[in-house]
Amino acid sequence: MIRPVFAAALVLVGMSSIAAAEDTLVVYFHQRPPYSARAADGGVHGITADVVTQAMSVAGVPYRWEELPSARQMEVIKRDEMPACGLGWFKRPERETFAKFSTAIYHDLPTIVVARQDDARFAGMPSIDALFADKTLTLLTKTGYSYGAELDGKIAAQKPKARADASDNQIMLGMVSRARVDYMIMAEEEAKDLLARPDLADAKLAIYHLANPPAGEYRYLMCSKSVPDAVIARINQAITPPQ
């Protein structure tokens, strides 16, 4: 027979474990080097992931990484079933209606274009407006993805010839290489990381800089409404402001 005192202790331990689990902040990420990726040591590393890891440690906020596609991250954060944050999101007015945002964790480099090395239409430093106006070019975009306020506005207003795809960027760059589409737009640090991979070594793709390129966007933690303001404040104090 379990003695009453021992049974009570077991209950308290169980309740403590549940409380600890509930107090652990879930931080969602998806495989997107150089921003975030699961490493061989089991941890999550990258430009934005490392900033958050350091901030959580300094702030003393218990957390755990959980891999989830970006579209699912937004759904879960909207539902607000538990305290959770998504890594590296752009801040948008429509997102602020259902989420809280940390201070900025990273500032992207200016936008560039990735296209085939032998495509003369990208020679020199074309403007993004000229590329969008050229109906012989097909832009490849990621389904449900924001390219920043300026580019989102230009895409909506100028309606360039475009095709959307939900694949990861490495697969999408393969589509550019095979001439199924003509170009993608992305931050320069991401493009450099992708083009350095062995899988794209023979892709014959190049980075093209733009005349008057859109400034790089700031990235944030996008959190569900149930994340306490006090927790976000602690995280904010521990984040080193990006340049």
Where are these regions (language model features)?
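Acidic, polar ligand-binding/catalytic clefts
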Residues: E66-A133, H209-P214
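Periplasmic-binding protein-like
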Residues: F29-P33, D108-P110, L200-N236
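Short coil/turn segments
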Residues: Q31-P33, A40-H45, R116-R121, T136-Y147, ...
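Extracytoplasmic small-molecule ligand-binding "clamshell" domains
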Residues: E22-F98, D165
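N-terminal signal peptide c-region/cleavage motif recognized by signal peptidases
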Residues: G14-I18
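Extended ligand-binding regions for polar small-molecule ligands
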Residues: G46-A59, Q117-M125, D129, E217-Q243
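Short helices/loops that flank or line small-molecule/ion binding pockets
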Residues: A71-A84, K100, N169-K192, R197-P198
